[in-house]
Regions:
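Hydrophobic heptad-repeat coiled-coil signature
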Residues: 115, 176-178
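Conserved metal-binding segment of the jelly-roll/cupin
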Residues: 106-127
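Non-catalytic, conserved peripheral segments adjacent to functional cores
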Residues: 1-108, 133-175
Length: 178
């Protein structure tokens, strides 16, 4: 069976949920979650400069993070496990400024989220997980910033019930190292 790329633009302009190319047979599966030409054919310019992975335990929240300089668009996919992935529009001129959207990413559904420049990004780890980031800009520690996961103005509705309640949360703000 072959599943072609599918691009679903969210109502936060420039953000997408992407179903990658996937070919399965009796041996297993082949998944391609990025192809520069396919992305460009769908109106998305996402040139890769850095790829990394995070490994997280159930109950961790990787809070809303972003870069103040050299904005970093990202293609995010859960390779294994399950995360509730959240993006936040941080563009003051945008009609959706301050709004957030969440989507369940799992190793099984293989969906990706394209996080545009000038957006915040974070996630709740529902199951022990490995998450892939394919970034259009390298990480600049001096420009790293974030918003608390429980910020009252954003009022993100994290699915705490999936991890046994909010008292089981372990907050972290990832500081990547080169």
């Amino acid at each position: 069976m072959v599943q072609k790329f599918d691009f679903q633009e969210l109502d936060l302009q420039g953000a997408y949920i992407i179903t990658p190319f996937c070919a399965t047979d009796n041996r297993g599966a082949f998944i391609k979650d990025y192809n520069i030409d396919t992305f460009k054919d769908n109106g998305i310019n996402h040139d890769l400069k850095e790829v990394f992975y995070t490994i997280s335990k159930k109950g961790v929240i990787r809070a809303i993070h972003f870069q103040l300089i050299k904005q970093q668009a990202k293609l995010v996919r859960c390779i294994s496990g399950h995360v509730y992935d959240v993006i936040v529009d941080l563009r003051p001129e945008s009609p959706t400024f301050g709004q957030w959207r969440g989507v369940h990413l799992t190793g099984e559904n293989t969906k990706c989220v394209l996080v545009p420049e000038r957006f915040g990004h974070g996630y709740l780890v529902v199951e022990d997980s490995i998450v892939s980031y394919k970034c259009a800009e390298v990480f600049y520690g001096e420009g790293d910033s974030g918003i608390m996961y429980n910020d009252p103005e954003l009022a993100i509705e994290w699915p705490y019930d999936l991890i046994g309640g909010s008292d089981t949360v372990s907050y972290t703000h990832l500081r990547a190292h080169e």
